Amino acid sequence: MKRKRVVSEHYVNNKEFLEALIVFKAKCLAAKEAGEPRPQISNYIGECFLKIATHLSYKPNFVNYMFREDMICDGIENCVQYIENFNPEKSKNPFAYFTQIIYYAFLRRIQKEKRQLEIKNKILDKSGYEVAFHTDD
């Protein structure tokens, strides 16, 4: 009796992702030589960016933030922005490359939200908001 082969549980296939990026990079070079704008990213590459960002947001250090969707959007935006910087000759691991981009995008969003919260708190302190709503017991 033969055993069924266990299917990998990874949500992004690194080899297929690398092949899609190589094809996209070739299209970018051809468009650049022809003087045309950068071609649109394929649905598969976009889906990989979304999966990486979504699954990274489930890590314990990111899961409880109220602005998690904004973090995911920032991560995807940065991946699209820096997709041409990925060099398949240097690295054969696009999953790690884009995970790092998304990770640091998450950290930047957290810092940005903390600054906004500090600004809100300073405005409330200066406006005397607490004094107006303080009750005498």
Per-range role (PLM):
Residues 6-8, 28-30, 112, 118, ...:
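Sequence-pattern detector for short linear motifs
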Residues 1, 7, 14, 76, ...:
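Alpha-helical interaction segments
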Residues 59-67, 79-101, 112-117:
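Short alpha-helix-to-loop micro-motif enriched in aromatics/charged/Gly
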Residues 1-70, 129-137:
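Extreme N-terminal regulatory/targeting segments of RNA polymerase sigma factors
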Residues 20-27, 78-82, 109:
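Solvent-exposed, amphipathic alpha-helical segments
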Residues 110, 118-137:
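Charged, low-cysteine interdomain linkers and short loop/connector segments
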